[in-house]
Design a protein with these regions (language model features):
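Sec-dependent signal peptide recognition
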Residues: 2-8
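Short hydrophobic transmembrane-like helices used for membrane targeting/insertion
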Residues: 1-2, 17
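Extracellular/lumen-exposed scaffold segments
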Residues: 16-154
Length: 154
């Protein structure tokens, strides 16, 4: 009887694991893919990111040194100068098991603004967004999202 109960329990556990929703490959997507700015003048490139429903990512300034901040790193490219990214203010969030500890996170859509100056024509601003995603129960290992934004200087 005990052996059958253990087998039934193992089968139910396996069914729950198999029926659990799969974790996304990426918890964030870059929602903007191209912009147009005045050529040879200071402008702002807005990179809009979308966090997958049910998840949040630590802001650029999380409230704990144990958490990994969201960080945009851009590569140098011909015809385009990019300044220091300006991150939005995060939203306070608390896990249900630790309601007294407030975290600073991004959920839904958030925009990082980057000062740019581009010459006339088409240019590509590339880099990476490093982030740590969490859901209501746990935080996951950090990930890196490749970022590519086409910038037209007119």
């Amino acid at each position: 009887v005990i052996g059958r109960a253990l087998l039934l329990g193992a089968a139910l556990l396996q069914m729950n694991v198999m029926n659990a929703p799969p974790k996304p490959k990426s918890y964030i997507v870059l929602a903007s893919d191209q912009i147009t700015v005045p050529a040879n003048k200071k402008a702002t490139a807005e990179l809009r990111f979308q966090v997958v429903d049910g998840f949040h990512v630590n802001s650029h300034t999380p409230k704990s040194e144990l958490l990994i901040p969201t960080n945009l790193k851009l590569n140098v490219a011909d015809g385009i100068k990019a300044g220091t990214p300006e991150y939005p203010k995060g939203t306070e969030y608390a896990f249900s098991f630790e309601p007294g500890e407030k975290l600073d996170v991004y959920t839904g859509s958030f925009t990082v603004k980057v000062p740019v100056e581009v010459s006339a024509g088409e240019h590509t601003l590339e880099g990476t967004l490093k982030y740590q995603a969490c859901d209501h129960a746990a935080c996951y290992p950090p990930k890196t999202l490749a970022v590519k934004l086409v910038v037209f200087g007119k």
